[in-house]
Amino acid sequence: MKDGKSLSAYLNAAGKKELANLLKFYCEQAAEEERSELAIWANELREKYYGKKVFFRGLIEFSNHCRNDCYYCGLRRSNSKINRYRLTQSEIIACCKNGYKLGFRTFVLQSGEDPYYTDARLGSIVFRIKELFPDCAVTLSCGERSYKSYKALFEAGADRYLLRHETASQEHYGKLHPPELSLITAKNVYSI
């Protein structure tokens, strides 16, 4: 696969497992020249589909409360050294209004896993944002929730949900999180 055309044909025909194996090979075993060729080809594809654009998102960190006590996280429940806050719906909407004036067309609402923001409360915020700014996307990143919750937030108008997970290794996950949290729960989200 010395030229981009044959590599392109291979990638278009390959399944996920084959792509994963190919990337693993290129990252771990391929010669520097082959890795460089792949990087050049990947950059050409990125430019073909996305151009030289930069996408800006308006990040609104609306709460630093979290019910979890993950060992690495500054928002962890047991961290008594931070001043906790929660933004009201009005404050969140004011952030969106300001961001809209500045040209943002995607708002990312991010928080710890804060039980105060029920589906109804968070859904109301999302609905209001979409009502005021119908040409904007809303992404939520509020930790693990139930399937019912994701569905309710989608129905309220959320366009995306960003669920962070730190690792796919059960052993490593156990070193980062207290026993009451489970990688299996996090992985189940991907089956939705």
PLM feature spans:
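Flexible, acidic/Gly-rich N-terminal and inter-domain linker regions that tether
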Residues: 1-69
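Residues within well-ordered alpha-helical secondary structure of globular protein domains
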Residues: 25-29, 44, 98, 128, ...
